[in-house]
Amino acid sequence: MRSPHEVMGHDGHAAMSMDAMADDMRNRFLVAAVLSVPILLWSAIGRQVLHFGAPAPFGLRDDVFQLILSLPVIGYSGWIFFDGAVRALRARTLDMMVLVAVAIAAGWTYSVVVTLRGGGDVFYEASTVLCAFVLLGHWLEMRARGGANDAVRALLDLAPPKAIVIRDGAQVEVPTSEVQVGDLLLIKPGAKVPVDAAVGDGTSEVDESVVTGESLPVAKAPGDALIGGSINTNGTLRARATRVGSDTALAQIVKLVQEAQSSKAPGQQLADRAAFWLVLVALVGGTLTLVAWLLAGRSFSQAILFAITVVVITCPDALGLATPTAIMVGTGLGAKRGILFKNAAAIEAAARVQVVVMDKTGTLTKGEPEVTELYTVGMPEEDVLALAAAVERDSEHPLAEAIVRRAEHAHVASRDATDFENVPGYGALAAVGGHRVAVGNARLMARESIDLDELAGMRDAMAAEGRTVVVVAVDGRPVALMGISDAPRPTAKVAVEALQQLGIDVVMLTGDNRATAERIARELGIREVMAEILPADKAGKIAELQRAGKKAAMVGDGVNDAPALAQADVGIAIGAGTDVAIETADIVLIRSDPFDVATAITIGRATLRKMRQNLGWAVGYNAIAIPIASGIFEPRFGLVLRPEIAALSMSGSSLLVAVNALLLKRLKPPEPEPTAVSPHTVR
């Protein structure tokens, strides 16, 4: 894995931050630029083209004065290129540092020899202006790459520097870095949560958008988890620290983003190999250019200028920047939305996905039972819910909890139940407000000698659609049927539609019975369903799609679906929350929002598109520039590039690549408009 310094060819900057590197490059550029002005004025160009007539100071010859002024440029400003070239050669490789060092050294050394031999045609200005332009390009390039890394910087700034810890009953403000697991934290309204913690006392709403991308505040109560870096909005919380330092979710997110940004995409590996050979071509091409012009009868000074221009303009800097800059922006874009790409290959693979296989429970659905249909006979819905909830409030069964939640959601008045009787496998009975209420399945009704009458057909139809049917009877008379199922997530339908609009096939994979799976699939618009699949067989189903020539992504919870996630071309773990380090996933979605799958693929495609644009520009630029630089158009058209112009062109090309990648920041993936499936009420 290469660091950003290595990606840019600046191993000598390895101990510096990106900002410090940019400042260092700026200082070197300013020295080179300021001194290059008088060097240019007292050069042949200044005398003959600019008609500058002032004599050199102290009675010195023009070339001697230029030599003196060039020493700081070569010794300080340009030293970074010589140092980088030595490092590259020691590593037995060739990079842009080698090319720039050769070009600067060749022109400057030739000029020094001419000066020491009594004077003649020199071009110190070519070496110093070349140095200045390359440094300018790198300075601007680093600033652009620094902008690409804004996402990581923003994440690092989320953690507050101080935390309030309660010790021996007293509130103590300590640096966040000193908080220990188990410490009792006091989190006031408006304050940031310093580390991952669990609420011990108090209720509040917490804004987790800066970490997870979740736009709405999340209600927190005792026992709920808090993410370090999130913002407590309205209530005072006391919480126990659960993870600190590098173990926090925020630290893990930053680590994943940084690892992804410094990893190589498959396309980048090809670009790196091409860059190596391009350097070799430049060195050989420069040598052949020198020899060719000498054989053509030109002077050595003219021939070496052409050779230096070829070496400079062939510099593969743009080729080396083409993919890593786009990767940095793409991963940062995902991180802001709670989408974590594990590596550069994951971005490229996401862009090529043709079919998305989604686990049903917990991915497309909420993963918990919910009353999705209510059919009443002879009694208002509010009364039915009030009576049923009164009976089920004392039960711990998941179906009972679903009925209580539906009653609370409808804001019905709470009633008390007495003589509660739980009948395992059947349901429950109780007395509520003078009525005998039975809530359970058909077997409970038969046990209590309650005839379903007209509700029998409706109950069978609901069961055939895969719902669990609960009957409510009051005083021996059935008054309602409740269809309970695992309801789709609010954004599940629009998530499927978004994927289909991207031209991607969506497949539901589940261990549930086919009737239940097909009902959910119909609601969401999914055309292909793989039902009644054992967990151990899910990976095999993914392999079948791959054998059919499809690039498949698997979306699951990262635990039960681990083998399938590993088998897929892209494994996407959804709903990771604070557990972002899921080993089998290539992409981690912090939120439990299936729409983020479409967003991740959109980001992947946009990033790959930028990578291809940048590579196309870098290759095309060299294909056009090298013949011009070699001077083959000079005899007929008089078209000549000087090394300084070549340096400006090369730097501009690199900057264009970096800026093009930064345009990714303007990408606005479609936002979902939740279309929750409302519970049906029929009377």
List the model feature ranges, each with a label.
Residues 31, 41, 48-64, 90, ...:
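Membrane-embedded alpha-helical bundles of multi-pass transporters
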Residues 154-247, 344-388, 431:
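Conserved cytosolic catalytic loops of P-type ATPases
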Residues 1-62, 75, 154, 169-173, ...:
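Flexible metal-binding regulatory segments at protein termini and peripheral loops
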Residues 189, 243, 263, 341, ...:
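Conserved ATP-binding TGD loop and adjacent catalytic N/P-domain core of P-type ATPases
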Residues 25-27, 230, 354-396, 426-507, ...:
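ATP-driven catalytic headpiece of P-type ATPases
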